Amino acid sequence: MKVVFLRHGESIWNRENRFTGWTDVDLSSRGIEEAENAARLLKEEGFEFDVAFCSVLKRAIRTLWIVLDKMDRMWIPVEKSWRLNERHYGALQGLNKSEMAKKYGEEQVLLWRRSYDIVPPRLENDDPRHPRFDPRYRSLPADELPAAESLKDTLERTVPYWKERIFPAILSGQKVLVSAHGNSIRALIKYIENMSEKEIVGLNIPTGFPLVYDLDEQGNKLACYYLGDLEEIEKAQHRVAAQGKASS
């Protein structure tokens, strides 16, 4: 049984090297091209999806639209959930990662970006960026809305959704595409592969490259691989890893 994870194409704030989190930033022109390329790769490998799952953030939604349009699958059911949103970066959202590395040091920024259980500085409850002011989360209990999240927090909301909605669809024989974000995908991979906290620090998910997982009936990994040119994928992974370094 296969499932395809797709991190959205490059966003405008990815391009500007800013912490994005739950900020609803759109794709850059390069991100649109990455989504189109992802669709081409999936078509070339013969993928045809029956259902898709997506976050409620437009960079993932637009990536999914582009992919389904290019694959002539716009008609399939799409389920959107905030539980697939990017990790919430709290008060760091909107700030430049390299500038933060200069101010606080690369090690601190790496901990904020890639550690498992360290939470970045939280938003104040009256901060207009707090999700309680966003209409898309109006129906959710206030205590479920984060002011900041660690990867552990992200895993605790994504894994139940995987168990309740996504994996049952895979188990039923449906061909599933998940359009999400670097950290929500990292959280799911940590769960699927039973990765240690140390191992997850080094996992970097590039934008726009389909990641295929072959699973057994218990949801354990049998194999996984990216679609695309391996050299380009490695370069993209290195770019993700370098985002928290102080620029010279």
Swiss-Prot record:
Pfam families in the cross-refs: His_Phos_1
Residues of the site described as Transition state stabilizer: H181
Single GO term (MF): phosphoglycerate mutase activity
Superkingdom of the organism of origin: Bacteria
Reaction(s) the record says it catalyses: (2R)-2-phosphoglycerate = (2R)-3-phosphoglycerate
Pathway: Carbohydrate degradation; glycolysis; pyruvate from D-glyceraldehyde 3-phosphate: step 3/5
InterPro entries in the record: His_Pase_superF_clade-1 (IPR013078), His_PPase_superfam (IPR029033), Phosphogly_mut1 (IPR005952)
UniProt-annotated catalytic positions: H8, E86
EC number(s) from the headed UniProt entry: 5.4.2.11
Keyword Isomerase (UniProt): yes
Keywords for this protein: Gluconeogenesis, Glycolysis, Isomerase
GO biological process per UniProt: gluconeogenesis; glycolytic process
Gene3D superfamilies per the UniProt record, alphabetical: Phosphoglycerate mutase-like
Record PANTHER family: PHOSPHOGLYCERATE MUTASE (PTHR11931)
Described purpose of this protein according to its UniProt entry: Catalyzes the interconversion of 2-phosphoglycerate and 3-phosphoglycerate.
Family: Belongs to the phosphoglycerate mutase family. BPG-dependent PGAM subfamily.
Protein name: 2,3-bisphosphoglycerate-dependent phosphoglycerate mutase
Source species: Methylacidiphilum infernorum (isolate V4)
Classification of source organism: Bacteria, Pseudomonadati, Verrucomicrobiota, Methylacidiphilae, Methylacidiphilales
Gene: gpmA
